[in-house]
Amino acid sequence: RLIARSGHIDLGTVATAKHETHGSLSDAGHRHVHQSAETGTAISAAGDITLAAGGRIRARQSQIDSSAGRTALYGTQGIQLSEGRQTLDLSEATRDKSRGLISSSSRSARYSRQHDEAVGSSIGGREVVLAAGKEGDILVRGSSIISDEATTLTGRNIGIAAAQSRYLDSEFHQTQKSGLTASLSDGVASAGYSKSRQSLQHKADITRLSESQIGSLKGNTTLAAAEQIDTRAATLSA
């Protein structure tokens, strides 16, 4: 049991980051990678799990699960489940050159990746209960609440929404060739110089929704609000 009779319960995250740098961004050949992620709180038990706060309960990218018991969250001033984020920022460029006796060629490529992904919270148990006080709201975003036998959410207002992930990707490829040329036409030989360039570019901007999932595998799913229930891009099942 985790009880804060007059205060709040905040299950936050710890941010981690990883960097990889080769060359300068202005160099024809370079690789820069920055990755970030969050590590949330994990609570697991075979029996009952209870979190009770006289204030609010906030859980970000948290996993709370009872394998055979009841998981209950009581927040007098409200309960909020939300997603954490993991990101990727990559810039990479390569260039290859080759030279022969009368010709030369070069191939270059540039890659860019900017990813911002949602990683939701999850709550599970044989039975799951989320209960807010008369003046408290329940907000669930990009997260899942799944029980084996019964799932119940009660509060003043209940809001269930999706979290967004965005992926920006671009690639650019270019091939250049140059060199001397020779031809024979009607017995006349001629020589010259030629230069060619071919380019290919691809860009993608993709937004994906991570739906919230509220349900029970074998029993009932109950949402009871004194005022309003608002669901957007959510899956409710029983």
Q: Where are the regions a protein language model picked out?
A:
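Binding/recognition "hotspot" determinant
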Residues: 1-238
